[in-house]
Amino acid sequence: MDEKRLTHLRQLEAESIHIIREVAAEFGNPVMMYSIGKDSSVMLHLARKAFYPGSLPFPLLHVDTGWKFREMYEFRDHTAKAYGCELLVHRNPQGEALGINPFVHGSAKHTDIMKTEGLKQALDKYGFDAAFGGARRDEEKSRAKERIYSFRDRFHRWDPKNQRPELWHNYNGQINKGESIRVFPLSNWTELDIWQYIYLENIDIVPLYLAAPRPVVERDGMLLMVDDDRIDLQPGEVIEQRMVRFRTLGCWPLTGAVASHAQTLPEIIEEMLVSTTSERQGRVIDRDQSGSMELKKRQGYF
């Protein structure tokens, strides 16, 4: 297809579909990570387009920490059922047995045990040799230098100094037994691209992305939504209703909301056009060196 005939979004769409089909043809046991957010929703939509009218030739995998927003769980189950997708859900049993949680053990330990170790357990359990992820290069500096085909050793570790060249849309998927590839079909998309494509294609998203009155507490300069009774209120903290939405979604005690009145997709897009901050400013796990994205990726995180 002549790229000159495609709009910017259609070029991105075509590239992503090409990558998804390439992985399905090249690897023996691929899986698509499904974290329930906007990027996962776009990636799933692209995968369904790639193999329409057939079904997906790989399952979805959600590595669950037990601390996602309730609306995320409802959306996950509804989506898998509506689209007829095979959904695998994995929780780290050792972490559950130890009662690991972000309030008691902190964001770094919670993320390492429930997310990173949970992910590695799931990949080993099912023997996946390729895993799709919805990460984009504009999100964060370590992701900006990562390849579309991201090689991982048999311990699931990423070495930024040992990456393969990717020239003219040619990807090297050769691996030895026990090694794997993380694949990022949305690498060249921006946050604005994602929202414009969601609007263009009428893709369903978790309602948390739209502004609404929600119960929040202000902590360390962030607005944390009180999603259930496990909240650990600190002295002086008061729960109040504010008009907020989320630019990124994760575990609710570690994800800050933003004050907003954007209740429709066009209003979100309008916000994006004037925004000067990263969507990951609301992620507690990105705020200190021990929780840096590159360090987590070296240890096996997505």
UniProtKB/Swiss-Prot annotation:
GO MF assignments: ATP binding; sulfate adenylyltransferase (ATP) activity
Alphabetical keyword list: ATP-binding, Nucleotide-binding, Nucleotidyltransferase, Transferase
Pathway(s) of this molecule: Sulfur metabolism; hydrogen sulfide biosynthesis; sulfite from sulfate: step 1/3
Catalyzed reactions per annotation: sulfate + ATP + H(+) = adenosine 5'-phosphosulfate + diphosphate
Keyword Nucleotidyltransferase on entry: yes
Pfam families documented for this protein: PAPS_reduct
Enzyme Commission number(s) of this protein: 2.7.7.4
GO biological process: hydrogen sulfide biosynthetic process; sulfate assimilation
Family: Belongs to the PAPS reductase family. CysD subfamily.
Protein task: With CysN forms the ATP sulfurylase (ATPS) that catalyzes the adenylation of sulfate producing adenosine 5'-phosphosulfate (APS) and diphosphate, the first enzymatic step in sulfur assimilation pathway. APS synthesis involves the formation of a high-energy phosphoric-sulfuric acid anhydride bond driven by GTP hydrolysis by CysN coupled to ATP hydrolysis by CysD.
Subunit structure: Heterodimer composed of CysD, the smaller subunit, and CysN.
Record's protein name: Sulfate adenylyltransferase subunit 2
Lineage: Bacteria, Pseudomonadati, Pseudomonadota, Gammaproteobacteria, Enterobacterales
Gene of this entry: cysD
